Design a protein with these regions (language model features):
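Cap/lid segment of the alpha/beta-hydrolase catalytic domain
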Residues: 10-12, 20-83, 91-95
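Proline/glycine-enriched tight loop/beta-turn segments at coil->beta junctions
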Residues: 6-16, 28, 100, 241-246
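Glycine-rich nucleophile elbow surrounding the catalytic serine of serine-hydrolase chemistry
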Residues: 25-26, 107-117, 257
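A short, hydrophobic beta-strand element of the alpha/beta-hydrolase
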Residues: 105, 132-134
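Short beta-strand-to-loop junctions in surface cap/lid or active-site-entrance loops
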Residues: 1-12, 22, 232-242
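Substrate-access "cap/lid" subdomains that shape
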Residues: 91, 116-117, 125, 134-266
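Alpha/beta-hydrolase fold nucleophile elbow
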Residues: 89, 96-108
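Mature extracellular/periplasmic domains of secretome proteins
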Residues: 35-39, 119-120, 237-239
Length: 266
């Protein structure tokens, strides 16, 4: 987390803008962006953050979530990272000359998507006061879609977690899965330890290789009823409208896809 502020701001209470970067929630970093002109012209504090991405940021598996309680039952780890950063800002930003009662979250593409998901999340209520979603969207996945618990889901999305682990049999996944399915109570903790032992780099490389050959999307935001509304972001926005009635700007950036045209072989 970085805080960027105007000169001589410590004794002031400036508006706070909290930036969530884009990148499909699979890539990107806070350091790509220069907000110096925004800060100079408008006298605001800008907070930029990193958060977990890809399968390390969103990973649904019953051997992990099924054995947990409370927040540990959610697979939306990246969403929790953003919420924790907001909590820290709300508590501490006054020490940097920011107003904890005037926080605007804003993001572009996947960042805009995350803005909308935070508007719909009960866990983020009261942590910000305005929101800007640039080229955001409301896509989310059911737990079954994210895990790939039936054949229809597997055929529709090669990047469902069970399908990835099964296809590539990372560290002997098939063997421990069979034991777990035969007796979930007995082998649940063993299964969980196995999953936690998988090398993070190997997991990322596996997803990267599969992504080259498919237009499937990595199941990112999962409708778990904890960090994300059980019926998805759109339903969550409708449900949160009365509770979280704050100013919102939502739109599409004109040149959103221009960056990708150069690499499109068609």
């Amino acid at each position: 987390l970085d805080i960027k502020a105007p000169v001589n701001n410590l004794n002031r209470r400036l508006p706070v803008m909290f930036w969530i970067h884009g990148g499909g929630n699979t890539s990107g970093i806070k350091d790509y962006y220069d907000f110096s002109e925004l800060i100079r012209r408008h006298q605001v504090l800008v907070v930029t953050i990193n958060y977990r991405l890809g399968p390390l940021g969103w990973f649904t598996h019953p051997a992990i979530q099924g054995l947990q309680n409370g927040l540990d039952k959610t697979s939306n780890f990246g969403t929790l990272d953003i919420i924790e950063a907001l909590k820290w800002v709300k508590k501490n930003i006054k020490n940097f000359g920011g107003d904890p009662d005037n926080i605007t979250i804003f993001g572009e593409s996947a960042g805009g998507h995350n803005v909308l998901s935070l508007l719909a999340s009960p866990l983020a209520e009261g942590l910000f006061h305005k929101a800007i979603s640039q080229s955001g969207y409301t896509t989310s996945f059911t737990v079954e879609e994210a895990y790939g618990s039936d054949q229809a889901v597997i055929s529709n999305n090669k990047l469902a977690s069970d399908n990835v682990l099964s296809t590539h049999d990372l560290s002997g996944y098939s063997s421990i899965k069979k034991l777990f399915l035969s007796n979930q109570q007995r082998y649940g903790e063993d299964y969980q330890r196995y999953l936690r032992s998988i090398d993070g780099k190997s997991l990322l490389e596996t997803y990267k290789q599969i992504s080259k050959d498919t237009y499937d999307r990595l199941p990112i935001l999962t409708r778990d009823g904890i960090a994300v509304h059980i019926d998805g972001v759109s339903a969550g926005l409708a449900a949160a409208k009365k509770k979280n009635n704050i100013p919102v700007i939502a739109g599409s950036n004109k040149d959103e896809l221009s960056l990708w045209l150069g690499s499109n072989r068609y």
